[in-house]
Amino acid sequence: MSGKSSETSGVRYRRYSFRFKETITTILARDDGAYRNAVRGMLYARGEIEKFIANDPLFLTTLEPYECDGKVVGRMCHASKIAGVGPMAAVAATIAWFGVEFADTDFIVIDNGGDIVARIDEPITVGIYCGRRKSIGFEIGECEIKSICTSSGKIGHSISFGFADAATIISENPSIADALATALGNMIGEDFKKRDIERVLEEFWRNYRKYIECAIVIKDDVFAFVGDLPEIKRVEINPDIITRG
């Protein structure tokens, strides 16, 4: 288990990094206490998940919706049933969610391997990294809880059966956002063009609009979305600060 922090120039928070087993996070917080509480929340969530897997190994490997109870795994199973994917599709954002809840502060952002959960009292700019030439950013305003989760068929180690550079969901429910990002990414075929992606997004919105604020797909030169798209920002994403293993 390891953690470190660095000053972030020009803003009123510090950037921390925390790693424990598969959990690799970047945390933005205003003080060490919030950071420590966030870590405590993530370790609590991991502990329940690991204990559940020890008693029910299928939970770890299934790609199908799953039935289970529990404070942590219950959120994952609920999301898996909504999205039609396995419960581990929601693991990163669910762990981050508990970190945000345990932090008990007005400003905390946790990026767990590219899945972001935030409680903030001032706007922040969030970037979606799709390679150096295709990355975008958008502004997220003050919120009690917000999640920006991304699945990619081209970047990262998470399972995706699709070919999107990025399939991103914005939602007030992090577990559902994570699971639905996986589901959306799986729907994007290798040869899909703009019209194909827009058709997928329209159907996706009809099915899931009550759970999400916005869905975004980036593939090759196509940028498409449905829902309430945040204000787009020009960003230069530094690959060195991207949260990844």
Set out the residue ranges of the language-model regions.
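Short, mixed-charge, low-aromatic patches
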Residues: M1-S6, G33, K51-T62, K134-I140, ...
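N-terminal, positively charged, Ser/Thr/Ala/Gly-biased leader segments
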Residues: M1-T23, I27
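A general structural signal for short secondary-structure junctions and capping/turn motifs
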Residues: S17-F18, I159-S160, R206-N207
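N-terminal low-complexity or amphipathic/hydrophobic leaders
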Residues: S17-M76
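Alpha-helix boundary/capping residues
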Residues: A45, L184, F204-N207
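Flexible, glycine/charged-enriched surface loops at secondary-structure junctions
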Residues: F52-E67, F107, G113, D191-D220, ...
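Conserved mixed alpha/beta catalytic, RNA-binding, or beta-rich assembly cores of soluble enzyme
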Residues: G74-V85, A89-L201, A224, L229-G245
